[in-house]
A protein has these predicted regions:
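N- or domain-start disorder-to-order transition segments that initiate the globular core
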Residues: 33-75
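Zymogen propeptides
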Residues: 60-61, 65-101
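A substrate-binding/cap region within the structured catalytic cores of diverse enzymes
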Residues: 120-251
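Acidic/histidine-rich, surface-exposed loop or edge segments in extracytoplasmic proteins
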Residues: 49, 72-81, 135-140, 227-228
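Membrane-embedded segments
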Residues: 84-95, 106-110, 116-126
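C-terminal regions of proteins
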Residues: 37-49, 157, 243-267, 272-338
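Bacterial N-terminal signal peptides
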Residues: 20-30
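Bacterial N-terminal signal peptides that target proteins for export
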Residues: 4-20
Length: 338
């Protein structure tokens, strides 16, 4: 036994009243600490969420709406990722556009729903005072490229027309994407259409993080396919995202020149899958515009109380910079894969 080890007699000697009081105080203190720690662990930040809020994904806390909207004007590119067929997401985009214009800015709008082959018709429609809707949809190749109800996106298109805002067709033509699906990327690159649409020499970057996430989602949403099927779908996804990034990066060159005159920001409006974790389009744009591009991602999501914890987990994984909690669309909650 060394001198630092108390003897059995010392360890069992009667405890003084003063020591008992000290022990009692320590128990109270530790009890309070345990209670506080438990409160921190069990507090669920998503219990405070509500429809209409914008949540900072880093903190899980809602941000004041008006200052946040005003702050968007400081970015060069704003990515809004929607759930298809949800009118509240169109309304959110209109809110952002109006806020930017109220600050003396002239935002440019880019939409996934229009293909490159429809850009000339889209430009004519925006300039014309006497456009016929049915003729416009035929000329812009709406059915061929998107195919959904134009009514879903008409408010955004008409806003750009009424306010004389530039509107960019963001998506590569559907015919080009079909070639990739049917033939594979290597063979598609050899076709005349690849050169026709300015894709010759374009880097189609196969980033590991992107591959892992997109392939996993394809397999979850399209079960039963062969490895070859998934590879061709994945390659088509890469080409779409790279093509949309090409559109945005090209727009940034004149926007930066004219920024001092109030032009911009560039508002990208796509499905949320092209925004998630910055992997599909934002990272590709940043690679193409490397000079300190300032961009922000906003993921718009139907707020379902029972799925709030799942959404919080996605925020912690970095699904976007901000998540805009919205009502569900007329068709109900979005389809979930598996």
């Amino acid at each position: 036994m060394n001198r630092f080890t108390p003897s059995l007699l010392q360890m069992t000697r009667p405890v003084s009243g003063r020591l008992l009081a000290l022990l009692a105080l320590m128990l109270v203190m530790f009890g309070c600490q345990t209670k506080d720690r438990s409160a921190i662990v069990t507090h669920r930040v998503w219990d405070e969420w509500a429809v209409g809020q914008v949540v900072d994904a880093r903190t899980g806390l809602a941000v004041p709406m008006q200052p946040w909207l005003e702050g968007l004007a400081t970015y060069e590119v704003i990515y809004l990722g929607e759930e298809h067929h949800n009118r509240s997401h169109i309304d959110a985009a209109l809110t952002v556009l109006r806020s930017l214009m109220s600050q003396g800015r002239r935002p440019w709008l880019a939409m996934e729903m229009f293909g490159w082959d429809g850009q000339p018709a889209l430009a004519r429609y925006l300039r014309s005072e006497e456009s016929v809707r049915s003729e416009f949809l035929e000329q812009v190749l709406w059915k061929q490229n998107w195919g959904g109800a134009f009514e879903d996106y008409e408010p955004l298109t008409e806003f750009a027309k009424d306010q004389h805002l530039p509107l960019l067709a963001m998506n590569p033509p559907k015919s080009l994407i079909r070639q990739v699906v049917k033939q594979g990327l290597v063979q598609a690159k050899e076709q005349p259409e690849w050169r026709q649409w300015g894709m010759e020499g374009e880097g189609i970057v196969d980033a590991p993080a992107y591959r892992s996430r997109i392939l996993s989602q394809l397999q979850d949403c399209h079960g039963g396919g062969s490895p070859e099927d998934y590879q061709s779908m994945y390659e088509a996804s890469m080409v779409r995202d790279e093509g949309m990034a090409k559109t945005l990066a090209a727009a940034m060159r004149p926007l930066r020149v004219e920024a001092s005159s109030g032009q911009g920001p560039l508002l990208s409006y796509t499905g949320g899958g092209h925004v998630q974790y910055r992997l599909p389009v934002p990272d590709r744009v940043a690679r193409r515009v490397p000079d300190g591009l300032k961009q922000v991602t906003v993921y718009m999501a139907t707020f379902e109380r029972e799925r709030a914890a799942e959404l919080h987990q996605a925020m912690q994984e970095g699904i976007a910079d901000y998540v805009w909690l919205t009502p569900q669309g007329a068709q109900g909650p979005p389809r979930r894969c598996r």
